[in-house]
């Protein structure tokens, strides 16, 4: 008899929809959650994996006639986040100068290593995994930004809103652009920020979730040596779309070309990278902008003219 009951139960189809309701008011917080094993199983089986082929077209026609040196990397990192660091006030650098230097040092040919000048960012996959039981309403907002860009709207590479109710949430961003290894603020090129909305779920010192991420990038000797895969700016697996959503960066629609515009084309400009020569005057070390012979001559004439004007004023006062 027990076997027939088990058989009947196994034939009962699972509900396709989950019910998730909660109430938050002055009386307190109340949560009612129900789900099916099918969706939960899908999310639990979702793997964090990223290959260079996911981001780059490796077999790419050589750019121009220059010999290209390209070194592909996929970096993996994981760390736990304290509940006090989930308010969106901090950022996580996904690529750092020290990391790039470490990979550059692995290039044995010093001559080739000295030519590497660019970092091509192909893809970043981020996995957030809860350190608490499944079934707790735990919304989280995330964004990957290029923090070197001062305009906040333009800095967004991709944004996501999810929930750790099933234990984890995952998405992938495809930056598909290049920066110099000499960039002064390289550590801010890929900055991950997050805001966990249940910041009262635990107390300071408690690790609320872990962040695991994979970054696929290439080190190369040219800005023109990489071909990226055709991908949307940000993607989310279908299974995670049931508990969250992603937003791509906006693409500006250009205004019609203005009827008139201007640009300064005056002579006497200094070349890019120009550094003024230091001079010592009255015990002061000065770094004045070097002037061309023509501008120096013009300055001398102006100084003579000023002295003549001053002398005329003094003579008038005497008379």
Curated annotation (Swiss-Prot):
Region (Disordered): 1-20
GO BP annotations, alphabetical order: transport of virus in host, cell to cell
Compartments where found: Host cell junction, Host plasmodesma
Gene Ontology cellular component annotations, sorted alphabetically: host cell plasmodesma
Coiled coil: 289-319
Alphabetically ordered keywords of this record: Coiled coil, Host cell junction, Transport, Viral movement protein
Pfam family, one: MP
Membrane-crossing segments per the record: none
Function: Transports viral genome to neighboring plant cells directly through plasmosdesmata, without any budding. The movement protein allows efficient cell to cell propagation, by bypassing the host cell wall barrier. Acts by forming tubules structures that increase the size exclusion limit (SEL) of plasmodesmata, thereby allowing viral ribonucleocapsids to spread directly to neighboring cells.
Subunit and interaction comment: Homotrimer, through the coiled-coil domain. Interacts with VAP.
Family statement drawn from the similarity comment of this UniProt entry: Belongs to the caulimoviridae movement protein family.
Protein name: Movement protein
Annotated source species: Carnation etched ring virus
